[in-house]
Amino acid sequence: MQKHPFTIAISGKGGTGKTTVSSLLIRSFIDLGEIPVLAVDADPNANLHEAMGVTVHETLGSMREEAFTRHIPPGMNRHDYVRFRFRQALVEANGFDLVAMGRPEGSGCYCFANDLLSECMLQLERDYRFIVIDTEAGMEHISRGTLGKPDMLLIVSDPGARGLRTITRIREIATQLGLEPERIHIVFNRFKSGTAPVDIGNDTPIAIIPDDPQVEAADLADTPVSQIPADSPARVAVLDLAHKIRHIASERDKKTV
């Protein structure tokens, strides 16, 4: 029986390294043999494709606009055209596929297109075991229903007081969207040795990713961060996170059999 994909949404304020965490998590699932992985870039300001070393030529947002502003080819209705273009927008790579959502537009007349994109995503998801979504702190695409409710939300944060405020705000948004507390996990990124992380109450971070010069070197060299050495501290930490997530996904599958 086909397993329902396990969806991980990764959120956090700008500058915390959530796109780095997203790309390393995708790479870790590939290393674990969980292929293909579906990578979803749902942050208009993010560059997940660059972190993964691929090129994106169009987004689903622009495709949706196109379906309403351009002439539809003869023999196609808007439903068929959107489905056709959706597959064209998908970037296929080694071990993963990537789709960029683009900037969300207003509702109203776009409700039809949003619903159709949601339908396309549901059909696409059947081909994957894990889906990693690099999303905005406000999680607009999730709140609009285009991406559905994730199985897990990872809040990437700095290990400091400002990080606590971000964690609290994103957690509130997630709760308002109906996400259960047990699905929400904290990831401290760029943790410097000898520093104490902010007190997050009864929560225990699911991962603490150390500050890694290899990540900074990749950024300075403009090379994909997902391709840093396998023994680099950040990559080792995220691989451990991937193991934990795979275990959680397996436990979920047992409950749904």
Regions found by a protein language model. Name each.
Residues 112-211, 217:
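Conserved catalytic-core segment of NTP-binding enzymes
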Residues 54-58, 173-174, 224-226:
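Short, hinge-like loop/turn segments at secondary-structure boundaries
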Residues 1-5:
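Phosphate-binding P-loop
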Residues 31-93:
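N-terminal phosphate/diphosphate-binding loop that engages ATP/GTP or pyrophosphate donors
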Residues 80-93, 97-135:
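Cytosolic-facing regulatory segments adjacent to core modules
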Residues 237-252:
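C-terminal alpha-helix
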Residues 221-232:
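C-terminal boundary of histidine-terminating zinc-finger modules
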Residues 6-44:
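Walker A/P-loop phosphate-binding motif and the immediately C-terminal alpha-helix
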